[in-house]
């Protein structure tokens, strides 16, 4: 069993989750006893980059940005998944973009996640339109109709994604950046807008692509973790080089 969690994972143990409390609960042992099988717990963005890697065998340095209810970053550096000393590497959603900004469940103010996540952007759209309920399909439909509030939300997505990628480039210098988000899945041309917004001369060789796997990238990453352990191998690709 492989579980993808929105939070910090270290050695199959949950250290921090921003929107629910699991840090005091040994979920791995509980599921192991319940189902009598090995259990792997990993950050969902890390699973996402492993899923993407399975179809991109020619890259050794990949940054995969997952934008859903939060914002996560999976990093594959020099051929290895990078999680840092205690699993906190890749928590790009909790880097600060406004020191006096919105409160975040992590305890800080102005975290990127509070401006870039689909949850945050849909909340902004709901407040701007005074609608009782919104979802991404509604936002998408109104964007296609050139609704000014929907356009403003898409512009904010491009703005904060540009900030996010600029920071990633300067910190990790990946070969390729993959964006896994409903925005870029349904509107892949947004990646070109983001590229045009990256003004630094350091970014000339960068490749930015929308994920072709979307939600299945996490699933495929989970499969990769379990199969590699079962076969006792270090590398697994779903396509040939």
Language-model regions: role of each:
Residues 1-61, 189-199:
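Glycine-rich phosphate-binding loop and adjoining helix at the ATP-binding site
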Residues 4, 48, 68-74, 221:
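Small-residue faces within membrane-embedded alpha-helices
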Residues 5, 67-69, 118, 181-182:
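Short secondary-structure boundary segments
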Residues 18-20, 40-43, 66, 209-216:
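Active-site nucleophile and cofactor-binding loops and adjacent substrate-binding regions
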Residues 33-37, 56-57, 99-103, 108, ...:
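ATP-binding/phosphotransfer module of carbohydrate and carboxylate kinases, centering on a glycine-rich
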Residues 57-115:
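Glycine-rich phosphate-binding loop of actin/hexokinase-like ATP-binding domains
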